[in-house]
Regions:
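Short cytosolic juxtamembrane segments of multi-pass membrane proteins
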Residues: 354-361
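Structural signal for membrane-spanning alpha-helices in multi-pass inner-membrane proteins
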Residues: 31-39, 179-180, 227, 231-235, ...
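Transmembrane helix boundary and interhelical loop/hinge segments in multi-pass membrane proteins
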Residues: 14, 91, 183-205
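Long, hydrophobic alpha-helical segments
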Residues: 166-188
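Alpha-helical transmembrane segments and their short interhelical loops
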Residues: 209, 213-283, 287, 332-339, ...
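Membrane-interfacial helix-loop-helix junctions in multi-pass membrane proteins
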Residues: 82, 158-163, 242, 294-349, ...
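Transmembrane helix segments
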Residues: 34-43, 273-312
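Extracytoplasmic/periplasmic domains immediately adjacent to an N-terminal transmembrane anchor
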Residues: 1-166, 334
Length: 361
């Protein structure tokens, strides 16, 4: 019965805040509309210049092949390698292809010509992938038998057949939505009451710690369900992406992650005295959890010490499980490890949240 009145108090506080309801409604929509386009990690628009020292029909055919490729932005032909290198130094060009003199003659005589590919490696990923793309095109032009072998080789792409990067990224964005809605908002809640002095009135009442903590968590869990529904609708309406698996798993995983972030937020707010202190501490944890979760880079590519943190990072388990539901349509058996890990981490964090709240006086 006490919990009921505490929840009514929390809802009244949320409704009285003119900014908070707008944030709850607009943040998931804006994030799902903008971030899938911004966080596209496919390497495209690689600026390429060509130095053709042969000026033959075969060399021009290679130049046209490079210019027609959708991954490249052809910047024209340079008069010499030094001129092309100057464009690289000025960041106008990402890669240079130098076709040697006698390119066509070597091909006619059955020799393999030496074509130079120079890539700007300031952006290591773009330079490496760009040089790989160029090398594949040159090999196909120099060795026609390689193209014949490629035509005989058939590959079958499982699950994400269109190789749509948004299908890979959108499930992970649910975690960012939960991070704000159930992480930051509960963090600022108790600290705001401390600054206003209303928390002292609560401390002198016979309300138990569990009831008080639940009254702070439950409203944001319901907000998390609303945000999840909005994200699912945006993913369906704007991108045509729906979970291949049971949609109930999406809500279960979201609630598990929401429990962790809301508990973490309460731990921080119980230990903080000012709003500024709570925001900076929460920002520290959020950035580390996000960067080490595998959202932006594969966890297997991390150094060994950083990879060990993924075993205690709930966001890492959440992203793996959500991608399983959306892309592969997995069942509980395929997500058992992730779900159990989230439950264990949530239990520890929830216990810490309850124990961190102490009545003063």
């Amino acid at each position: 019965m006490v919990l009921k009145y505490l929840l009514q108090k929390e809802w009244l506080q949320i409704r009285r805040n003119s900014f908070l309801p707008r944030l709850i409604l607009t943040y998931p929509i804006m994030l799902m509309c903008v971030m899938p386009w911004v966080m596209n990690m496919e390497v495209k628009n690689i600026a390429v210049a060509v130095v053709d020292n042969d000026h033959s029909a075969r060399s021009q055919q290679l130049v046209h092949t490079i210019a027609a490729n959708r991954y490249f932005r052809f910047m024209g032909e340079a008069s010499s390698y030094d001129a092309a290198l100057q464009n690289v130094e000025q960041s106008h060009v990402d890669g240079v292809v130098v076709i040697p003199q006698g390119f066509a003659k070597d091909l006619q005589q059955g020799h393999t010509p030496h074509v130079l590919v120079a890539a700007n490696a300031v952006n290591g990923t773009k330079g490496a992938i760009g040089s790989l793309y160029l090398s594949q095109i040159i090999v196909q032009a120099v060795m026609p038998e390689a193209q014949a072998i490629r035509e005989q080789f058939h590959s079958y792409i499982l699950y994400n057949r269109s190789q749509n990067f948004k299908l890979f990224m959108i499930p992970a964005l649910f975690g960012i939505v939960m991070m704000l809605m159930t992480g930051y908002l509960p963090t600022l809640n108790i600290v705001a009451e401390k600054e206003k002095g209303t928390i002292e009135q609560m401390n002198v009442t016979p309300v138990s710690r569990c009831s008080f903590i639940l009254s702070k968590l439950i409203p944001y869990w319901l907000i998390a369900l609303l945000g999840t529904t909005m994200c699912l609708l945006v993913a369906w309406l704007f991108y045509g992406i729906v979970p291949v698996g049971n949609i109930a798993w999406v809500y279960l995983l979201v609630m598990l992650l929401a429990f962790f972030f809301s508990s973490l937020g309460l731990v921080i707010s119980n230990r903080s005295d000012t709003m500024q202190q709570a925001i900076f501490v929460m920002w520290f944890f959020v950035m580390n959890i996000l960067l080490l979760s595998g959202l932006f880079t594969p966890t297997r590519s991390m150094p060994a010490a950083a990879y060990l943190t993924t075993y205690v990072n709930p966001m890492s388990y959440f992203i793996d499980a959500m991608r399983t539901v959306f892309v592969r349509g997995g069942n509980f058996g395929s997500m058992f490890h992730q779900v159990v890990a989230l439950v264990v981490i949530d239990s520890l964090m929830g216990f810490w949240a309850v124990m961190s709240y102490k009545k003063n006086g």
